């Protein structure tokens, strides 16, 4: 479904609808015109939040608890500010409700990704060409994909690394790739659950599936983990080409230092 859900009632953003009417029924992304909460960016930085987790998010009753400004919960903030909505409600083994959350629609996905990207690069004009990454995945051109990602990290201002403690965490680099791909409108699954573990990032396209694992400073071999745990088995019945991609980041160079890939062969 598309839009918001509050315990059974579906709705769209009313202010978005008013803007749509006032602009003579012109279809466009109106999310930024409803406000850009910069405090979300600061909360992400402060808590080292792994953004791909937003696609498989489950919370308990704290979601509906009162808003405590002295104890900000990132998931609750996203829910109350409209960046997350209830997908469905389940009952835990203890009998209490559990809420599965989702990002409401593509407009919100792109808006959330864009505010993070703009903050990261500081200048929208230096953001690497999105077309290169988009085309590389559509054309299954892994060399171009690698080069585009490398260029993307190279374009991040140095101060954003030196003044950011998150740069020492694997989640920092994975989150950048996640928001960048999401801003392009791809179907992204973060922390994709399989019977053998969790895939860091899965990109599902019409003609192919990309299974991506991230590592930091060569501590482990990313591609080897994908093959060892047979993450690809989850998608064998989709009759699509499957690409296994292992990416390692170097915290000194602040970029990718190893990019290995294989096309899965039946």
Where are each of the predicted segments found?
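A short helix-loop-helix "switch/interaction" segment in the helical subdomain of ASCE P-loop NTPases
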Residues: 1-12
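Extended alpha-helical interface modules used as scaffolds for assembling large macromolecular complexes
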Residues: 12-224, 228-230, 241, 254-266
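Short catalytic/binding micro-motifs of nucleotide second-messenger systems
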Residues: 231-235
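Extended hydrophobic secondary-structure segments that form protein cores and membrane-embedded regions
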Residues: 243-248
């Amino acid at each position: 479904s598309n839009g918001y859900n509050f315990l059974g009632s579906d709705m769209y953003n009313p202010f978005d609808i008013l803007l749509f009417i006032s602009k003579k029924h012109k279809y466009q992304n109106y999310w930024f015109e409803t406000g850009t909460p910069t405090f979300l960016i600061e909360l992400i930085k402060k808590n080292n939040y792994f953004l791909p987790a937003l696609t498989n998010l489950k919370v308990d009753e704290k979601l509906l608890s009162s808003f405590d400004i002295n104890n900000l919960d990132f998931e609750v903030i996203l829910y109350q500010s409209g960046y997350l909505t209830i997908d469905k409600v389940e009952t835990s083994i203890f009998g209490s409700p559990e809420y599965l959350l989702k990002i409401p629609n593509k407009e919100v996905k792109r808006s959330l990704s864009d505010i993070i990207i703009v903050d990261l690069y500081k200048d929208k004009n230096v953001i690497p060409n999105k077309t290169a990454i988009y085309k590389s995945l559509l054309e299954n051109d892994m060399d171009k994909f690698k080069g585009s990602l490398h260029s993307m990290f190279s374009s991040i201002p140095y101060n954003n690394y030196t003044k950011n403690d998150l740069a020492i965490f694997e989640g920092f680099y994975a989150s950048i790739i996640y928001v960048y791909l999401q801003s392009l409108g791809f179907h992204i699954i973060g922390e994709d659950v399989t019977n053998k573990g969790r895939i860091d990032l899965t990109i599902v396209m019409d003609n192919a599936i990309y299974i991506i694992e991230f590592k930091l400073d060569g501590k482990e071999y990313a591609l080897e983990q994908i093959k060892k745990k047979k993450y690809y088995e989850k998608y064998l019945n989709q009759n699509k080409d499957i690409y296994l991609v292992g990416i390692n980041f170097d915290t000194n160079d602040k970029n990718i230092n190893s990019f290995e890939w294989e096309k899965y062969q039946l």
